[in-house]
Amino acid sequence: MTTPTPLRSVTVNTPPPYTIAIGPGLLHDPPRLAATIRGRHALILSDSEVAPRYAAQLHETLLRARPDLHLNVFTLPAGETSKSLENFGAAIAQLATLGATRDACLFALGGGVIGDLAGFTAACWMRGIDYVQVPTTLLAMVDSSVGGKTAVDIPQGKNMVGAFHPPRAVIADTDTLATLPLRELRAGLSEVIKYGAIRDPVFFHWLQTTREALLARDPAALAQAIARSCEHKADIVGRDPLEKGERVLLNLGHTFGHAIETTQGYSTPGSNNLNHGEAVAVGMVLAARLSNTLGLAPAEDTETLKNLLDAYGLPTVLPSGLTPEMLLERMRLDKKNIAGRLRLVLWRGIGHAEAVPDVDEAAVRQILAN
């Protein structure tokens, strides 16, 4: 008989604190879901891939516990291109039509795109209402749903318009990972690997030895990977909720990755363009190679990281057609930069990341060219 996967809980000690619940069957838990709602209005925001699978279940569960609830569902097309100012306006209009008051709650049912857009919408409606992250992708469970960063994209760059607005709760039903496409599972594992790379060599080694179980979606292995990743993010975010210090280390590979995404065009269902997790995988290898070039990290650790990403089926080289100057143009707009100079998260080897100010563009250009 299969042993049930236990429910795991991680607390994020930001002001205000909130809990990440991780486990199977959480979309069927009326008391847990309803406990997050303070008022009588709620909106479920989802996308065209996730809503047909899970929106009706979430809707039913909420109404079972709160039959008095005024509850609507708003569905957007799947893909990064939906994280736009136009759709932000559409979500605001949905709240207005619902008659949402300041004690309303918005449920973000989907991946990182939906979570970011829903969070930003919640941050702005009546200067801030509650929202609950209900992530259905591995990447959202381990990264974007935790920490309160909310944003939309503009043509000049990714996540350029946003706010810090912590969720009221994160409810990660791991049963939803059963329907996740393999490519999206791998994208989430890229962010999981990042946690080992920046601060946990033991976890990094565990990921080396547990690859087959994770790719086979073993429930216990996935629950452990999600919980450990969330513990790392909660630990950092609890001390640095507004990214004034160490939280920036969570961005290993992201400056390169965001530049890749915005230069090539955002990935959409069926697209060959790199998705976020894939772009971060390439970005981590580029950051590691740059660290080696600058004398910060041993070359063998870079090779170990590249080999692990390769083993998980993730890309580790730049897509063709992206020139160094095209990417640098995007990197110069990165939010982490100071006084117009590149500030990158690099590393000193497995488990040790650091933010490096005033990085020489010539060194970056050389890495991008090779």
Curated annotation (Swiss-Prot):
GO terms (molecular function) for this protein are:
3-dehydroquinate synthase activity; metal ion binding; nucleotide binding
Report the cofactors.
NAD(+); Co(2+); Zn(2+)
Superkingdom, taxonomy of origin: Bacteria
Keyword flag DNA-binding: no
Cell location:
Cytoplasm
One Pfam family, please name it: DHQS_C
Which keywords belong to this entry? Answer: Amino-acid biosynthesis, Aromatic amino acid biosynthesis, Cobalt, Cytoplasm, Lyase, Metal-binding, NAD, Nucleotide-binding, Zinc
Q: In which pathway does it act?
A: Metabolic intermediate biosynthesis; chorismate biosynthesis; chorismate from D-erythrose 4-phosphate and phosphoenolpyruvate: step 2/7
Indicate which residues the UniProt annotation says bind NAD(+).
Answer: 112-116, 136-137, 149, 158, 176-179
**Gene Ontology CC terms, in alphabetical order:** cytoplasm
In the record, the note on similarity to other proteins reads:
Belongs to the sugar phosphate cyclases superfamily. Dehydroquinate synthase family.
Q: Which PANTHER family match?
A: 3-DEHYDROQUINATE SYNTHASE (PTHR43622), 3-DEHYDROQUINATE SYNTHASE, CHLOROPLASTIC (PTHR43622:SF7)
Q: What is this protein called?
A: 3-dehydroquinate synthase
